[in-house]
């Protein structure tokens, strides 16, 4: 569960290291975002000569959360960190690599490019 002012790590090679959630997209009073949801973030920390700079406001999709997610078969999955992948206006990732596992819930939300780049889908 990600809400406004949450800090997230970045799971791609766009050059950003830390993100800060500004807004959860999908309704004016929506408070929480989970895996596969799109949020508006600010880049709080970035490496030099990166595709994004510190202070940039971009969109990102959440790929891992510490809060567990229930699956239809009754199982649950949770991760060790809150991570997101920076995306462009057409919901394609800016980076060319994804680091760490991502959740299977991204497939239902139509983020196929992220699924194909990820080293492991849990």
Swiss-Prot record:
GO BP: any one term: translation
The entry's keywords: Ribonucleoprotein, Ribosomal protein, RNA-binding, rRNA-binding
GO cellular component: cytosolic large ribosomal subunit
Gene3D superfamilies associated with the record: Ribosomal protein L14 (2.40.150.20)
Top-level taxon of origin: Bacteria
One MF annotation (Gene Ontology) recorded for this entry: structural constituent of ribosome
Coiled coil spans: none
SMART domains named in the record: Ribosomal_L14
Family: Belongs to the universal ribosomal protein uL14 family.
Function according to Swiss-Prot or TrEMBL: Binds to 23S rRNA. Forms part of two intersubunit bridges in the 70S ribosome.
Protein name: Large ribosomal subunit protein uL14
Taxonomy of the source species: Bacteria, Pseudomonadati, Thermodesulfobacteriota, Desulfobacteria, Desulfobacterales
């Amino acid at each position: 569960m990600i809400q406004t002012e949450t800090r997230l790590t970045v799971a791609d090679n766009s050059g950003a290291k830390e993100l800060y959630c500004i807004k959860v997209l999908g309704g004016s009073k929506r408070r929480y975002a989970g895996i596969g949801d799109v949020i508006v973030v600010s880049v709080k920390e970035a490496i030099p000569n990166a595709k994004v700079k510190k202070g940039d406001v971009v969109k990102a999709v959440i790929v891992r959360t510490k809060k567990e997610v229930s699956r239809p078969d009754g199982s649950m999955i949770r991760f060790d960190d809150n991570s997101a992948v920076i995306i462009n206006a057409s919901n394609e990732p800016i980076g060319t690599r994804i680091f760490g596992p991502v959740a299977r819930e991204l497939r239902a939300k139509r983020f196929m490019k992220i699924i194909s780049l990820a080293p492991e889908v849990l």
